[in-house]
């Protein structure tokens, strides 16, 4: 099994998978009589159909045992999905490019610094949320509407990957 190298999360490195949601280096302007700095349009919510709605949820995630064997990835073909850490803790992101199925050799791993969120573009393969802390909370922006919006792909044993945040 191949061990994934964990890369720092940057806008450039993550661009083919979605948006990095962060204030560092982002455009902003003042509002509310100059008392508030607005970092505008950090990501775009994607939905497949006009009747789909963007919704906001909170996911409370428990840490998984590490090192982790990456056995599966999922994708959301009908909408984007954003994860914004609420407690400021670093977390891990495992992704693969859009396609009929994820290619094990193209899977990449990233580490958020805890002040960065991610917005997965429609159809991007990704692992379910991976917190490093025992328990963590994430603001999630995704799509509500008709139709199945979650496909799962399970790797064969030869395709499985190892994720070790302590490497």
UniProtKB/Swiss-Prot annotation:
Protein name (database record): Ureidoglycolate lyase
NCBIfam families, per database record: PRK03606.1-2, PRK13395.1
Cofactor(s) listed in the protein's UniProt record: Ni(2+)
Source species of the chain: Pseudomonas putida (strain ATCC 47054 / DSM 6125 / CFBP 8728 / NCIMB 11950 / KT2440)
Pathway: Nitrogen metabolism; (S)-allantoin degradation
MF annotations from Gene Ontology: ureidoglycolate hydrolase activity; ureidoglycolate lyase activity
Family: Belongs to the ureidoglycolate lyase family.
Reaction(s) catalysed by this chain's protein: (S)-ureidoglycolate = urea + glyoxylate
Enzyme class: lyase
């Amino acid at each position: 099994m191949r061990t994934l190298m964990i890369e720092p999360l940057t806008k450039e490195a993550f661009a083919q998978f979605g948006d990095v949601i962060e204030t560092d280096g982002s455009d902003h302007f003042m509002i509310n009589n100059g008392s508030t700095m607005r970092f505008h349009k950090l990501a775009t919510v994607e939905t497949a159909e006009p009747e789909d709605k963007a919704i906001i949820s909170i996911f409370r995630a428990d840490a998984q045992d590490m090192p982790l064997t990456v056995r599966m990835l999922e994708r959301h073909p009908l909408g984007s999905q954003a994860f914004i850490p609420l407690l400021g803790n670093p977390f891990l992101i495992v992704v693969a490019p859009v396609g009929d199925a994820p290619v094990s050799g193209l899977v990449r791993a990233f580490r958020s610094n805890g002040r960065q969120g991610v917005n997965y573009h429609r159809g991007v393969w990704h692992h379910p949320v991976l917190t490093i802390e025992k328990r963590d909370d994430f603001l999630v922006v995704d799509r509500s509407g008709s139709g199945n919006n979650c496909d799962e792909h399970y790797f064969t044993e030869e395709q499985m990957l190892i994720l070790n945040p302590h490497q």
